[in-house]
Amino acid sequence: MKVRILIEQDEDGIFVAECPSLPGCVSQGNTRNEAIRNVQDAIRGYLESLKKHDEPIPPSIDEEIVEIAL
């Protein structure tokens, strides 16, 4: 299974990673790679919890993140 994640660096320099298609799957790290590893763990835990409670896995959402200039 592949999911898209969004990574942003906050004002304190911390990288925040989230999976928009899986509500609540958010993590952070001091580096981009650490944030990715941490959100992967959060996603795995989320999916395991769904499976444990016989909940359906949300369908993949075709998302696109576009950067625009203002």
Regions found by a protein language model. Name each.
Residues 7-22:
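Short aromatic-glycine-(Arg/Gly/Cys) micro-motifs in beta-strand/loop hairpins
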